[in-house]
């Protein structure tokens, strides 16, 4: 009797461990990718789930929340052969956890490479002036092309933003000179307007004074 007691405790502990490993509680906005003997078996959604602890394992935990990736500045050549430094922010969501897991190796790196290629293609058809003044158009075109290209990977691109567009040093210098000239022009116009208004006030004052003297 007493000899069977430790054996019974061992059986009970083993059973509890098996049950514990069989239970998988998936958090909200998460999906667990389950593999059985190294092969995809199922995707567990949020809530209480059960797996076979002997043959099943959690191969990957996939977030369904919107994710943001900020890629470093990349050199891009415009249609008129100017090299622009552009950094891009991508907002995306995983819509198919299975495709995201097995569709492509290192998906974030793949998105970065695809973003660089798409950006080069779009900017390559635009001049410097068009690039600097068409940010919204570039964002939209980037989103459409990236969304279509990443769909086979179970990814939806919600938004693309060009965080900064930096032209070459000589173009920046020319732009700064142009802006300075424009500021000086506005200042001269304001100064001339102020002098004209002052002269009008002086003339009006002299006119009123002359009228008073005549009376």
Q: How would you describe each model-predicted region?
A:
Residues 1-75, 100, 104, 112, ...:
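Interfacial loop/beta elements and low-complexity acidic/Ser/Thr-rich segments
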Residues 62-215:
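Elongated, amphipathic alpha-helices that form coiled-coils and helical stalk/scaffold elements used
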């Amino acid at each position: 009797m007493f000899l069977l007691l430790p054996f019974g405790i061992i059986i009970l502990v083993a059973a509890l461990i098996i049950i514990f490993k069989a239970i998988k509680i998936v958090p909200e906005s998460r999906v667990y990718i389950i593999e059985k003997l190294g092969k995809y078996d199922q995707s567990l959604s949020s809530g209480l789930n059960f797996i076979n602890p002997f043959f099943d394992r959690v191969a990957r935990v996939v977030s369904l929340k919107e994710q943001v990736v900020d890629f470093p500045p990349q050199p891009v050549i415009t249609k008129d052969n100017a090299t622009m430094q552009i950094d891009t922010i991508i907002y995306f969501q995983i819509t198919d956890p299975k495709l995201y897991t097995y569709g492509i190796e290192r998906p974030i790196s793949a998105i970065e490479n695809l973003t660089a290629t798409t950006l080069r293609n779009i900017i390559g058809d635009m001049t410097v002036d068009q690039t600097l003044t068409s940010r919204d158009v570039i964002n939209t075109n980037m989103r459409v092309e990236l969304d279509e290209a990443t769909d086979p990977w179970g990814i939806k691109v919600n938004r693309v933003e060009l965080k900064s567009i930096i032209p070459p040093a000589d173009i920046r210098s020319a732009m700064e000179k142009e802006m300075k000239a424009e500021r000086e022009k506005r200042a001269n116009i304001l100064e001339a307007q102020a002098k004209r208004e002052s002269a009008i006030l002086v003339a009006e004052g002299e006119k009123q004074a002359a009228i008073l003297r005549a009376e």
